[in-house]
Amino acid sequence: MTVDLNKMGQAAREASRQLALLGEQKKNQVLETVAQELLAKADEIIAANKVDLENATNMPEKFIDRLKIDNDRIAAMAEGVRQVAQLADPIGKIDAGWVNYAGLQIEKKRVPLGVVGMIFEARPNVTVDASALCFKSGNAVILRGGKEALQTNIKITKVIRQALEQEGINPDAVQVITETSHELANEFMQLTDYLDVLIPRGSARLIQTVLNTAKVPVIETGAGICHVYVDKFADKKMAVEITTNAKVQRPSVCNAIENLVIHQDVAQEYLPAIADELQKYNVELRGDEKVCEILGDKATLATAEDWDTEYNDYIIAIKIVSSIDEAIDFINEHNTKHSEAIITENYTRSQKFLDEIDAACVYVNASTRFTDGFEFGFGAEIGISTQKLHARGPMGLEALTSTKYVIRGNGQIRK
């Protein structure tokens, strides 16, 4: 192997010590330089991306959408970096403080995790997002992207490292693995001497592989089998607009819905309107027998597998239920604990949905597409966690920190 992960890990650990001591003003100055360099080197980044796109000509459209970079997306990346710079620095924040019975002053203080490992697929924006968030939270990061985006990731990382050097920061705070073999990926996932946490972003298959292989602690950023439930007290216009937005605005991402659940009392009236709007975008409709009776040849019969499939495409599975309890049970059985929405004008039923749905983000009368660090005001996000330990939902700066207890005394000894 030409890549020495132990050397990369050692270098990242050394860089992380410098980052942990940086003040907020310096961090923000560095991030502004990173944003400026991304914009200044846009042509170089797009040229590198073109090489990756040429090598991916046989890939599906949804894959190409995630891989492609243009001036607008680079501008969005730079804006994301600037958003991170504007956020309050969590490092050094005191979560709690008290004096115990012995007169010890105890504080619970926010500190960096240390060295973060990222494994992701054809999403070059993750390179920028992860670098900015890790830097602002005082962490070094080692990036392992998919082979399909290798040239883009190498170029973006080079631009970021140059910006760090301009500001007198150890460039090894941001490193990319330039070899994409499975053997090296497995070694990376077991780099316990240097990595404090591993964060995968990508398909359900990638995330499961990381969970099965890693010895480093993992924050699971799960796949997105998300639902909209149209309650019997839903506003029809809202049901049509939210369902359509949640499915078609960007179907290749994890917060797009895959399943629509609708109450039988409004299905006869609402479903044709929803179907007509979805079919304007050539969405393929799959449904249970009742759905097919209502929609006729507009829909095909769904299989059991459809309810558990993350399509990331213009396909939706539709289920008619007889009660809100059936809707909740169905969603909890088939979801990936990501994002779920109810459309209803009934407050009591909305509260029931909020209380009983097991997911990182639960919406009332809004699209699941808002599950995003930028939309939540976190700036860029490191991922969307679907687990319950350490972090859950869109992961911003605080999710990349831990705590330490600082205790000050004046000679106390325990008796």
Swiss-Prot record:
Transmembrane segments: none annotated. Its EC number is 1.2.1.41. Its main location: cytoplasm. The keyword rRNA-binding does not apply. It catalyses: L-glutamate 5-semialdehyde + phosphate + NADP(+) = L-glutamyl 5-phosphate + NADPH + H(+). GO terms for molecular function: glutamate-5-semialdehyde dehydrogenase activity; NADP binding. Disulfide bonds: none annotated. One of its GO terms (cellular component) is cytoplasm. It is found in: Cytoplasm. Keywords: Amino-acid biosynthesis, Cytoplasm, NADP, Oxidoreductase, Proline biosynthesis. It holds the Pfam family Aldedh. GO terms for biological process: L-proline biosynthetic process. Pathway: Amino-acid biosynthesis; L-proline biosynthesis; L-glutamate 5-semialdehyde from L-glutamate: step 2/2. The keyword Transit peptide does not apply. CDD domains: ALDH_F18-19_ProA-GPR. Catalyzes the NADPH-dependent reduction of L-glutamate 5-phosphate into L-glutamate 5-semialdehyde and phosphate. The product spontaneously undergoes cyclization to form 1-pyrroline-5-carboxylate. Belongs to the gamma-glutamyl phosphate reductase family. This is Gamma-glutamyl phosphate reductase.
